[in-house]
């Protein structure tokens, strides 16, 4: 809104109005504003949650070997993150930009889904919350909306990157002059760092492109569902999900920024995406909101984000990556989320297979994987066999959290480095 106001005032030579035309200025304003909102509003909101007794106990206090008591800690803190994202975007963003619209829809959509889950847990005293099938329906619905919008909107275009070679060596990367709709996505080790979903069905001839879009929509649905659930599982320790997501958000912000500048996109050999510069405003709001939230969520947590926050930040990461055509980099960038997902899947399937044979068996001491590292041998079921018992010693959750952050930083660096590998 302020963007449009100052754009109008610029006609009258209003001092400073021209600054709002620069993405860099609006991005810095967004990250500062979102941080202040989450830090200042957060304190008042946490006190409100306490007065209303909207609190949560430790999900499983028996797994905390350090006897850290987490009784009566407010939940639904994800509302702080959502508000701190939306306000700067509404004030500083171009609200007619299709990418900004999609990100705002994603934030509100999954924020509502997570809120319903937390509401059922807190007010209806149902620990299971919203039934799993309704969560999946909500995630699939969002993925379908995002995928179809990117397919149907005439504003969603790219300029493909092309390598110029001489004597077998790449001497320059240029971009085609024409904007085009495309099912291509960025992935390392492929020609021009691009993979076209339509290539999977090239045998269909003229129909390959249309079927390629169907594949793209299905991939979108899968990525949104997987990453939002991964972030949800990762939210099991103080500061874990917020810290990891801020690091991932920073990496996506860098990729969005270079994708919106044709020269920088050429340097990294990735496609140029006109209009994607507005995503930098959004991701700066996202990062600022998470950092401000960490002020209260770092160990020992004064507030939990709940599913209101974790489902939302996971969905934001997924949709953002899809919009900038970097969804196939998610297994690297969001490696922590992937491992959390896989650890739960392996644990459940291995347990069920053992149950059919009449004995108890598990892969890890506990799942998701972060709980494995803080579970003592004394806490294990003596009647159950475990594939992985190491480490014998346990770590404090703050140490586990910081180490997971470090792993995410390394994965973020690898994600960017892989784009320069020829």
Swiss-Prot record:
Transmembrane segment boundaries: 28-48, 71-91, 95-115, 136-156, 208-228, 239-259, 279-299, 313-333, 399-419
Entry cofactors: Mg(2+)
Reactions catalysed, as given in the entry: UDP-N-acetyl-alpha-D-muramoyl-L-alanyl-gamma-D-glutamyl-meso-2,6-diaminopimeloyl-D-alanyl-D-alanine + di-trans,octa-cis-undecaprenyl phosphate = di-trans,octa-cis-undecaprenyl diphospho-N-acetyl-alpha-D-muramoyl-L-alanyl-D-glutamyl-meso-2,6-diaminopimeloyl-D-alanyl-D-alanine + UMP
Compartment(s): Cell inner membrane
Membrane topology (UniProt): Multi-pass membrane protein
Class of the enzyme per the UniProt entry, highest EC level: transferase
Cysteines paired by S-S bonds: none
Pathway(s) this gene product operates in, as recorded in its UniProt entry: Cell wall biogenesis; peptidoglycan biosynthesis
Keywords: Cell cycle, Cell division, Cell inner membrane, Cell membrane, Cell shape, Cell wall biogenesis/degradation, Magnesium, Membrane, Metal-binding, Peptidoglycan synthesis, Transferase, Transmembrane, Transmembrane helix
Gene Ontology molecular function, alphabetical: metal ion binding; phospho-N-acetylmuramoyl-pentapeptide-transferase activity; UDP-N-acetylmuramoyl-L-alanyl-D-glutamyl-meso-2,6-diaminopimelyl-D-alanyl-D-alanine:undecaprenyl-phosphate transferase activity
Enzyme Commission (EC) number: 2.7.8.13
InterPro entries: Glycosyl_transferase_4, PNAcMuramoyl-5peptid_Trfase, PNAcMuramoyl-5peptid_Trfase_CS
Principal cellular location given in the protein's record: membrane
Pfam families given in the database record: Glycos_transf_4
Coiled-coil residue spans: none
Keyword DNA-binding: no
GO process annotations (BP): cell division; cell wall organization; peptidoglycan biosynthetic process; regulation of cell shape
Gene Ontology CC annotations of this record: plasma membrane
Family: Belongs to the glycosyltransferase 4 family. MraY subfamily.
Function: Catalyzes the initial step of the lipid cycle reactions in the biosynthesis of the cell wall peptidoglycan: transfers peptidoglycan precursor phospho-MurNAc-pentapeptide from UDP-MurNAc-pentapeptide onto the lipid carrier undecaprenyl phosphate, yielding undecaprenyl-pyrophosphoryl-MurNAc-pentapeptide, known as lipid I.
Protein name as it appears in the record: Phospho-N-acetylmuramoyl-pentapeptide-transferase
Organism: Phocaeicola vulgatus (strain ATCC 8482 / DSM 1447 / JCM 5826 / CCUG 4940 / NBRC 14291 / NCTC 11154) (Bacteroides vulgatus)
